[in-house]
Design a protein with these regions (language model features):
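Hydrophobic, aromatic-enriched alpha-helical segments typical of multi-pass transmembrane helices
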Residues: 1-143
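Short, Lys/Arg-enriched, Gly/Pro-containing loop segments at transmembrane-helix junctions
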Residues: 143-150
Length: 150
């Protein structure tokens, strides 16, 4: 629910800036996918030979969560300079994006081996959560003193 509210706030904050608004919509999509992933539980072991409908929907929701947050992060690599005037956050966004994408092959290998998928998933999502927290902090500061603290 918080992703929906935050995404809506981001979209509303940048009226007239389509890419910035789109990044907010992506955060909202991430929120909807998070709800969906919670509604559709994993099968025991989370990787059965014949997954249930719930498992497939859970996996699809997880994919949408990853894709929407990754794309929002990618947009902010550009938008941090363009809309926030923050080269630092642009570089931070790029670093988070690289780490998030670098973990993906490890996650894929973990699916094949059946070991440590959750670890890589948490690293990936942890980096995304840190990035999102930093974005929220910057936007909060921007509301108090536009661009002065960035």
């Amino acid at each position: 629910m918080l992703f929906l509210l935050f995404g809506g706030a981001v979209a509303g904050l940048f009226s007239g800036a389509r890419l910035a608004q789109f990044s907010g919509l992506l955060l909202m999509l991430h929120g909807l996918a998070s709800i969906s992933a919670g509604l559709f539980a994993c099968d025991p072991g989370c990787n059965p030979v014949e997954p249930s409908r719930d498992q497939m929907l859970h996996n699809l929701s997880g994919l949408v969560m990853f894709a929407s947050l990754t794309l929002a992060n990618l947009l902010r690599v550009y938008l941090a300079r363009e809309r926030l005037g923050s080269a630092g956050f642009s570089w931070f966004s790029l670093a988070c994006l690289i780490v998030s994408l670098a973990v993906m092959p490890m996650m894929a290998a973990a699916v094949e081996s059946g070991e440590a998928f959750g670890l890589y998933q948490r690293i990936n999502y942890g980096v995304a959560a840190i990035w999102l927290g930093r974005l929220a902090w910057i936007l909060t500061r921007m509301q108090r003193a536009p661009l002065a603290v960035l």
